[in-house]
Amino acid sequence: MTNLTQLEMIIEKAFDDRDSIKTTTKGEIRESVEHALNLLDKGEIRVAERQKNGQWHVHQWLKKAVLLFFRLNPMQIIAGGVNGTYWWDKVPSKFSNWQETDFKKANFRSVPGTIVRHSAYIAPNVILMPSFVNLGAFIDEGTMVDTWATVGSCAQIGKHVHLSGGVGLGGVLEPLQANPTIIEDHCFIGARSEVVEGCIIREGAVLGMGVFIGKSTKIIDRTTGEVFIGEVPAYSVVVPGSLPGKPLPNGEVGPNLYCAVIVKRVDQKTREKTSINDLLRD
């Protein structure tokens, strides 16, 4: 197959002419899109990569490949439902045609009720409780995805992360220019928290239960007063909070507005030695 540079060129050109691409399209375009998704599925390439300077580089062409996949493939019966029922979709399961040897080689745990779509990568020693992992996502080694957590399209999850029950990580296929949601290594995301809109949770950070982080969320360090937008600093401990409301026209106190509050910052050694509950205690 073509190298990655050629693959990118073919997919970029095809995406520019995407209105002409149909389920009947064959040849180079179909082969390139399928090859790109297979590479994503194996973890040989990924939608976003962390650079040496700590910044994340997003390969937009891979997101385009995922979108082209929808144009190239018709709806189809997908087996595996409860009591022999089916689903109706364009994207097969990651586990289609897998046998015992495939699971042993992949070396991660997938509990019944888990859904992982083709092109998502799951690294060794990951534990997937009944959860949903969407296209193009990357989940690195030793991470726990707890019950009813959702990992959105192209989300990037680091090593030894804990996504608690009901956590939601947003997907970013559209708008196309959006960056993926990123959770770096050794983070803990508390139950029912949401991280969306391409926000980054930096290494070792702890989000308490019910923290919501989007691009408009103010993340306030209560010690320094510093305000962060779109990114939680490394080794921060974050809980839900609120900002005082502005006075209403009649002079009454207005409603408070949601924010996230950094209650403390810890170093790596403290983070490793201290339990999550102790970190979250004020």
Swiss-Prot record:
One of its GO terms (cellular component) is cytoplasm. It comes from the Bacteria. It catalyses: (S)-2,3,4,5-tetrahydrodipicolinate + succinyl-CoA + H2O = (S)-2-succinylamino-6-oxoheptanedioate + CoA. Substrate binds at residues 109, 146. Its EC number is 2.3.1.117. GO terms for biological process: diaminopimelate biosynthetic process; lysine biosynthetic process via diaminopimelate. It is an enzyme of class 2 (transferase). Pathway: Amino-acid biosynthesis; L-lysine biosynthesis via DAP pathway; LL-2,6-diaminopimelate from (S)-tetrahydrodipicolinate (succinylase route): step 1/3. It holds the Pfam family Hexapep_2. GO terms for molecular function: 2,3,4,5-tetrahydropyridine-2,6-dicarboxylate N-succinyltransferase activity. Disulfide bonds: none annotated. Homotrimer. Belongs to the transferase hexapeptide repeat family. This is 2,3,4,5-tetrahydropyridine-2,6-dicarboxylate N-succinyltransferase. It comes from Bartonella quintana (strain Toulouse).
